[in-house]
Amino acid sequence: MHRPRSSWPNLVWDHSFPHHVLTQGKYTTIPYRTYICLQGNETSLKEAEWAIRNDNPRALVKSYNKELWTFTLQEGVTPPSALDRFQLTETTTGVFLPSTTTPSSLTMTKQLTPPGYVALMLAIEAMIQEALKRDDHYVPFGNNLILPVTGDLLHLDARLTPGGDLLLQMYQQETEWEMFGKRKRDVANEIVGTKVVVAPTLVEGVVENSTNQIPDNLPVLLEMLDCLCSVRLRAKKQWTAVRIDTEVLLWPTELLFVDRKSATGKLEDEGKDALLWTEDILDSVFEATQLIRRGESGVNTNESTAAQPQPAQNGTNSMAPAAGTTNATTQRNEENKQIYPTPPEAPKRILPGILLERATAPAGGWGELDEELFGGDEVTEADFNFFDDMGGDKNDTDGDNDNGNDNDNDKADAMDVDVKEEAKKEEMIKKETKEEVPVKEEVQEEEPDESATTAALLTNNPAEEKAVVHGVNDSSTVNGAVDAAVSATVVSSVPYLPSDFDQLIVNPAEQRTFALVEFNREAEQRLNDKYAAGGRFFVPDDSSSDNEGSSDNTGDSSDSGDGSESVPRDVKRQKVDEGTLSDQTDEPEIDAKQLHQQWSAILNYNHDDKPAKKIDSSNDTTNSDGNSNNSNYEEAVQRLAEQVVWDNSCYKGLVPQENYYRPPSARFVKVVEQVFGDTSKRLSLIDFAKMSDKGGQQQPGVGMPINAAAGTAGGGPGTPVTVSNASGVPSGSSGAQASQMGALAVGSALSPSRGATPQPEGSSPETRPSNWTPGITSQVNSAASSPVPLQQHQQQQQSFSPMSPQTPAQAPVPSANSFANAANAAPTQRLATPMYSFMRGGSLIKAQPPILRFWSTFGLSPRNGPKPLTLTLIYPSGTAIGDAAAAFLISFKMCYEGCGFGLVTLGGSNGTGVVSSDYKNLDVSREGVLLVSNPYNDVLGFLNLAKAAAAGSKTATSTSTILTLPCSIFASYTALRAPSAMLLAALCRNLYDHLPPTSTKRRYGSVIQRQAPACVISKPVPPFINFKLLANTPDSVINEDSLLHVAYAASNRWITCAWSDQWGELAKVKVFCLQSESGPLRTLEEVCTEIWETTLQLNGSTDVRSVAVAKLGGMLDDELAMWLRVSSVTRGRRITPFFLVVDNRPSMVVTGSDDGSKGGNVAGGPAPAPPTGAAGAASTGSAPMSTPFRDTDSPDIYNHVTTPSVGEDKIDYDDMSIVDVHDEIHSVTLNHRQPLTMHSTRLGLATGYLVKTSPLNPNQLLVFSLTFVNCPCVVMHVAMKHFLRQYRNLISLAATTGVCDPEYAIVPWHVEAVDKMMRLVEEL
C-alpha cells in the first residue's frame, strides 16, 4: 500500500558505499625472471617454487606453462632467484609493463594475453593463500579456499589494470560442505558409504571406515601436502579409509568433506513421491524389458556379484564393468549398431609394463604418416574402423600392408611373438569372462592375502589403479564443442613429487584421449579435439550391422577374424624390450612407490576435468523405437521446463537454489591488509565505477628486457623478448615457446563452471569477418571451441556479411573520448519502475506493478478481453483427496471469473470438473484446459508425469492446454490446505496468459507459450521521432519498440533458450538436448542456427529492428564469430544484432554504507527533503505551514465543494499509488572495461550493473551484470544505459509473471528462465 516517502528506506547511496575490491598500490613496472629446465624435468620447477616460498612466504613465485616465474613489487629489489641445486636455466630478465594488457590498434586481429600477466596473477593469489593457510587455518578446496569450521568457500581474483592498479576482489560463498568427522556419529562408523570429496583436489570417493592406524609412509604424504598444496595437518589426526572407484586408501579425516544435507540424514528417501500409491507404467515396462534381456544374455542379476570389481590376471586389466553400473547402456549399444564406441576405450588394453616404457621412452612420432593418418579434422567411418575393429586387417589404415611393410613383419623378433601370445591369452580370458561368470571366483583365489597389505593401501591391484585414473578422467560423454564454449579450463598442476622419490607418476589431470600413442604434438592436439566428444558417433551406414558380434556387453571390441592371427593394434605399435615385457607378467609388490603413485594421482587431480553426468537410461527408453523415445523424452523435458518457468514459486523445491556471494570475513580482510601493508585500500562503489583505463600504447611482448638493447624487441604482439641461456639454447624452445603461443585465460570471474579454453600449441591466429569487433579478441582454442575447423573458418572469411546494410564494415571499439564522456555523466542512477497497461471499467489505464496483486480488489480486467474455457482437474485416486480437489476447483473457477478472465465451464463426465486417475494411463484428450495435480516431489517423478502427458497428447483427438499444479497446494496428510487469494489470482492470470486468443487471427500461432497476456508494460511516449535518413547507424540505435531479447545458457548436454520482447507481449522458452540416446550429436552451431531461425520467425510478426543475444556465462571469441556468421542471415530484413554476456551471480559484492542506513548515495547529491503529505510532496516538496485555529471546523465541510477547473490550481494525485519498496533498482555504468575472464586481458566493450537491496540483509545488495562483447554503437555507455533500462523492465516482468520471487527479482525474466531451466535439466 501507499507509504509516505518520509518512511521509505534511503536507497540513494553515498560515496561510503563499500565495494569489496582492495587496491594494493600502483605499479608501472614489475621486474621479473623466468627459468626453464633443459632436461625437461618439471619436478624441479615445483621444487624450486616450494623452496623459494618456504624461505620467504611473501615471495612472488609461480610455476606456470613449463616455466618458473619470479616477480617483485618493491622498487630497487630484484626478483627472487632459483637455487642452483634445482638445475634451472635463466632465460629472461625483464620488466613487465601493465600497459601491454590493453589493445590499442584497431587493425589487430588478435589480442594475446601476455604470459607474464597470468603468471603474475597466479603468484599474487598464491602468496595470499599461503598467508591465509598459515594464519587463518584455511584449507585448499580446488582452486579456492574453504574454512572447515563454517564450510564457507573463499574466492580470490587478482587483476592488474592497464594503468598499473593492482586490484584484489574478494567474496565468500556459503556452501553445504562440512568436514567429515565433525559429527560424532561419522567417526563412529554409523554412516558407511557416505559420499565425500577429498581435499584439496576434490576427488570424489565413498567412506569405507575410520581407523586410528597411521600410514607407514606418513612423512611422504606430509611433505607432498606441504609442497603441492601448502597443507599442514594438525597434531591429532584421524584417518578414514576412502574408496575411489576401485581403490581404497587412507586419507586424513580433516581433509574429507561431506554434503551437509546427507550428513544430517537427509538422504534420497525425502525425494520419493508425495503419494506412494502411484507407479509410472513406463518404468515397469523398462524393468520388465531389462529382465528379459538379462535372461536371454545369461547375465547374472545378482547385485552383490555385479558390484564386485573384476580382478586382473597376469597383469592385464579387468574387462568387467565398473561397480554400480547396469547393462542398460550396453543393451542400447546392441540396438543402435550405427553408434560406435570411441578411442577412449583403447588405452585399457595397454599393459602396465608397456605404460612404464611409454612414460620413459623418448618423444617420437609417426613421421610422414602423421598427415595421412591423423591430419583430417572430419569424423569419418574409417576413424572408428581404425580404433574399434580390433579384429582382422581388412580395415587397417596404418599402412602395415603397403610399401613393403610385409618385410618388416618378417623381421619381427621373438619379442613380437611374445606380445602376440600375450594378446591371445588376453582374448581367451575375455571370452571365458563373458561366457562363464564363475571364472571370477577362480581369479579371486590368486589375489594376495589382505594381511600382507600395508595400512596405507588396502587394494594393490595395478590394473584397478589404472581404472581409477581412467575413471576419474573419462570424458566419453562430453560434447567437445559445447564444453569448450561453456566450461572453465584451469591450468592443472604439474606432476610432482619430492626429488628423492623416483617413480612413475600418473597425473589424471593430463590424461588425454590419445595420451598413450606417440605422434607429433600438432596431430595429437587435433585428435584430442576431434574425439573430445567421446562416447559415440552417428555413422549412417547399413554395413555397420555386419560387425554385430564384434562388441561385447562391456563396450570393448573383440576380434571378428581369426583369433590366432590378430593382435590389437595398440599392442602391435609398442616397441618394448625384454625386461619391460617380463615385468608385465610378474605380480607387483607392495612398496612405497605404489603408495606414492596413488597419493600423487590424488593430489594432481583436476576437478574441472570431471566427466559430465551420464545420461540416465531409465528415463530415456520407453519402447523399441529409439527415435520415438528420443522425441518423447525431449518433448517431456520441454513440457517440464514450461511448467517450472512460470510456477509462481510452486515448484521452488525442485530447482536447486544458488546462493549469492557474500562479503568476506573481517579476519580475511585483515590478513590481506597485513600482507600488503599500508598500500592496501578498500574501494567504494563510486570510485570503482569512475576508474578509467589509462594504459598506453600496445607494447610488444611482456616488456623490454633489462639485458637487451633497445630496438631488439622484435616479434609480434604478445611475444616475449628473451635472451640466450648459458648453454646457447634459445629461450624460444620448450617452455618459452609454449609461453608465447600457449598463453591462456584460466577460470572465469563469472562462475567456477564458466570460462575460457587454453590455446593449443602450434595454432595460428585466424582471420576475422568484416563485422568483427577487435577490441575484445583474445587468445582462445579455435580448434576445440569453434564448431568449424580453423582452416574452414579461414576459407569462410569472405562469406560474412555486415550486420545491416547501413552498418559500417568495421565495428568500432570504445575510444578514449567515449569513456571520457561517460566519466562526465553520472555513473549511477535510479531506474524508474515501469507502468503496466490493463483495462478498468472499459478504459485502458496504466499503473505500477504492485496493483496487480490486488487485481480483483480494484476491479481490473485483461486488456485482450475474456478467454472462456472448459476446466477439468485430474487428481490421484482417493476419497479424501477428491473432496479437496473439488473444493479447490470451485475456488479456482470463482477466482478466474471474478478477475474477469472469462466464463469457466466445468468438464468431466458428471459435470463436476474433477476426474480421478491412476496416472498410468493419463487421458489428456479432453476439451479445454486440464489442471493436472502433480503428486511428485522430485524431478524424475515430475518428468514421468510429463512423459505420460506428452504420450497422451499425440493420441488426443482435440487440442487441450495442460497446466500442472502440486498436490500440496490443496491437499495434505496432516492439515487442511488452501491457496491464498493472491496465489490463486496469480495462477489464474498465468493460465489466462497461456491460453491462445479467442480471435481467429493469431499473431504468432502456436510457436510461443504466452500470447495476448492480461497486462503488458505500458509503452511510454517517445521523447523524439527519429526521421533522419543516415548512411551509418546512429548511436541511439535502440529506439522504442524495436528490440527483441534472446537469452541462452549452455552445458555439456543441454542448451536452454528464451525469447522476449520489451513489453511482455511475447514469451517463449525452449530446451535443446545435445546428447540424445539415439541419433547424431548436435553441435553448438546447429542449435544456435535453430535459435536464430526462431528469432527470425518471431521477428516476422513484429517491427523489431534490433536483436539482443545474451549468453549466461562466458562467450569465447570463436563462439562470437559463429554468432556473427549465423546472424548474417537476415532474409531481407534490416536487423542489427547485439551480443552480450550476463551473470546473475557476479563476483562484485557490495554491502551497505557505514552509517547503518539501507543503501548509500550512488546518484550523488543531497537526498530530497521528505514530505509530510501527498499534496506537499507533489507540489512544493516541503512541509506545509501550520494552520491556526485547527480545532475550528472549516465551513467547506458542510457545503458542496465543486471540482476545480482546468485553469485553477489542482492537486497532483500521481503520487497516490501503490509502490513496492523492495522493487527499487539502481544502475551502475563502469567507466572502464572489465575483463571477461579471470586471469586474462580479454576486455568487454562496456559493463553495467543492476543493484537492489536484499530483503533478508538490508546492508547487502543483489547484483546483476551485463557486458557488451559486440555492439554496433560508437558510444558504448549510451547503449549500455539503454540496455540497463530495458533489463530493468524485464526484471519487473519476472516478478509479475511468476518466474521468480518479487522480493528477490534482480534478473530479467528471460535470463532467469534459462538459468532456471538449466538448473532443472541438470538434475535429470
Swiss-Prot record:
Coiled coil: none annotated. GO terms for cellular component: mediator complex. It comes from the Eukaryota. Keywords: Activator, Nucleus, Repressor, Transcription, Transcription regulation. InterPro entries: Med13_C, Mediator_complx_sub13, Mediator_Med13_N. Residues 546-566, 618-631, 724-743, 785-816, 1172-1184 have a biased composition (Low complexity). GO terms for biological process: positive regulation of transcription by RNA polymerase II. Residues 298-331, 750-784 have a biased composition (Polar residues). Residues 296-346, 386-455, 535-590, 607-631, 694-816, 1151-1198 are annotated as: Disordered. The keyword Isomerase does not apply. Residues 408-442, 567-578, 607-617 have a biased composition (Basic and acidic residues). GO terms for molecular function: transcription coactivator activity. Its main location: nucleus. It is found in: Nucleus. Residues 398-407 have a biased composition (Acidic residues). Component of the SRB8-11 complex. The SRB8-11 complex is a regulatory module of the Mediator complex which is itself involved in regulation of basal and activated RNA polymerase II-dependent transcription. The SRB8-11 complex may be involved in the transcriptional repression of a subset of genes regulated by Mediator. It may inhibit the association of the Mediator complex with RNA polymerase II to form the holoenzyme complex. PANTHER family: MEDIATOR OF RNA POLYMERASE II TRANSCRIPTION SUBUNIT 13. Component of the SRB8-11 complex, which itself associates with the Mediator complex. This is Mediator of RNA polymerase II transcription subunit 13. It comes from Yarrowia lipolytica (strain CLIB 122 / E 150).
